[in-house]
């Protein structure tokens, strides 16, 4: 038996029928919606390669949470907002092309990626941190960055440039949430 799911993915309302109750959010995103930036690493919720951000109302405000899509069931996002790395880059009005979100720009400026497999997961954890802290005028300390990124593993770059990127977010222009 299947039930429909309704959620926002980025700025688009998704109405999906016939999603099996056994489907994980990762399976829904990669197999059904073609979101290839969401990676399957460990499939146990330990590496963070599959990180997406969920938004839900919390005391009248939108609260952002980075979650592992490999261990979250697809139907659990019903009536929520969801972002993947494909959803956060704003469009340039003049050219119509994507620009970089500040978290992506910070990672580029700090040379915080090598092979790139873990990068979308780090982008999304940084995006949640950005929305919950930087966009509200709060600086990000090294300790906060370490705590917020503790669910993401990188085997190539090391964590110093990634933590540097997190700490420079408040120095970049603010991005509007789509």
Give the label of every model feature segment.
Residues 1-178:
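Signature of N-terminal electron-transfer/Fe-S-associated modules in redox systems
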């Amino acid at each position: 038996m299947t039930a429909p799911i309704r959620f926002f993915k980025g700025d688009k309302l998704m109405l999906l029928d016939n999603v099996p109750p056994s489907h994980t959010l990762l399976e829904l995103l990669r197999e059904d919606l073609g979101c290839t930036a969401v990676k399957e690493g460990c499939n146990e919720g330990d590496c963070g390669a599959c990180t997406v951000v969920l938004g839900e109302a919390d005391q009248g405000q939108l609260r952002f949470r980075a979650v592992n899509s490999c261990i979250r069931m697809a139907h659990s996002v019903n009536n929520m907002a969801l972002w993947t790395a494909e959803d956060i880059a704003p469009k340039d009005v003049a050219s119509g092309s994507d620009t970089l979100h500040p978290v992506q720009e910070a990672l580029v400026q700090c040379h915080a990626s090598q092979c790139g497999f873990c990068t979308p997961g780090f982008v999304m954890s940084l995006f949640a941190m950005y929305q919950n802290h930087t966009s509200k005028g709060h600086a990000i300390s090294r300790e906060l960055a370490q705590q917020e990124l503790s669910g993401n593993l990188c085997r190539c770059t090391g964590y110093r440039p990634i933590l540097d990127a997190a700490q420079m977010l408040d120095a970049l222009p603010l991005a509007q949430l789509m």
